[in-house]
Regions:
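Terminal alpha-helical anchor/extension segments at protein ends
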Residues: 1-161
């Protein structure tokens, strides 16, 4: 009888805010490659600066604000799509970071046929550099919370049979 080869699970931790994402890949319990992506989303600062010019003509300012908003949303979406492009073949995803960006990414992941249902944890986290993002990913995937998640998932799969 053939012995089943246990393939290593491909896991990824994604730390992100509006401008940056770190994607930490793991095979089994080992950290593989770590990718840093930077978004094209314009920062708020530039928007604030634009205000002075348009203050005199209120409606023009609003139009411009709407355009900027629209452009930012499109840029954000393409940033999330770029992140998704780095997640092929990932079995388990851990999303963490400050602010709202992770909600947008989570939403897009759940609409993706290959990745929907693969997010195992979704947490608020502080600003981090790459090294800290690696440490947090490692801590999550080697910790009890993830072990418990897998135990529960096995039970659920058995129950479904």
């Amino acid at each position: 009888r053939m012995k089943k080869i246990k393939s290593l699970e491909h896991k990824a931790g994604i730390w992100l805010d509006q401008e940056t994402a770190y994607i930490v890949h793991m095979e089994g319990d080992a950290v593989g490659k770590v990718e840093g992506l930077i978004s094209d989303v314009e920062s708020r600062a530039r928007m604030a600066g634009e205000g002075k010019v348009y203050a005199r003509f209120g409606h023009t300012f609003l139009d411009n604000q709407e355009k900027t908003q629209h452009r930012q949303n499109n840029q954000r979406k393409s940033f999330f799509k770029e992140i998704l492009g780095h997640l092929h073949g990932v079995n388990f995803l851990y999303l963490f970071g400050p602010g709202k960006a992770r909600y947008g990414l989570h939403h897009l992941i759940e609409k993706d046929q290959q990745l929907a249902g693969h997010v195992v944890a979704f947490e608020a986290a502080d600003r981090m550099n790459k090294r800290e993002a690696v440490a947090a990913t490692l801590a999550y995937f080697t910790g009890d919370q993830f072990k418990q998640y897998k135990k529960d998932r096995r039970k659920a799969l058995k129950a479904a049979l």
